[in-house]
Amino acid sequence: MGISKLAHYSIRTTDLEASRRFYTDVMNFRVGFRPPFDFPGLWLYFDGDESEYGVVHLIGIDPDDPGRLVRYLGERSADGMTGTGSVDHLAFLATDWPKMRERCDAHKVAYRQRTVPSLGLHQVFIIDPSGLTVELNYPAREGSS
């Protein structure tokens, strides 16, 4: 049996609410079903599709009771709690860059962009509240709009 696709990525965060706002208000994900784990968190979905398991899992770190999370997912160094660590970035295919640009501007989210003609892509890079770089790949024609 081979690997067929990326199921989700998880972000440990000390500010669950800031991460929720970023992924729902800027990235346009939706909070959906999450099992009743014994630690704070949210599962985020595209387009209301809950047929799978969410694409982003936000894992809240409770500074008053970190043991619940450690028991479930294991210990992590506080040094690795921001940025992407050894992962450079995560990327999504996307459409409607003008609408996303409006959301970024409205929420004061900085972005870097470039068009890569040989790939037919307009790439936009944004940083989430935990310092994770997210790449959004739009059709190249959207880069001029």
In which residue ranges do the predicted regions lie?
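N-terminal beta-strand motif that seeds the catalytic metal site of vicinal oxygen chelate
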Residues: 1-20, 87-90, 140-145
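Core segments of cupin and vicinal oxygen chelate
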Residues: 12-61
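Short hydrophobic/aromatic beta-strand micro-patches
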Residues: 10-12, 45, 91-93, 127
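Short, flexible, mixed-charge acidic loops at enzyme active sites
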Residues: 66-77
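Vicinal oxygen chelate
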Residues: 2, 92, 98-145
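Active-site/binding-pocket entry motifs
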Residues: 50, 64-65, 142
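Exposed loop/turn and edge beta-strand positions of beta-sandwich/beta-sheet ligand-binding modules
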Residues: 5, 38-40, 86, 120
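Conserved catalytic-core motifs of GNAT/GCN5-like acyltransferases
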Residues: 10, 30-37, 114-117, 141-144
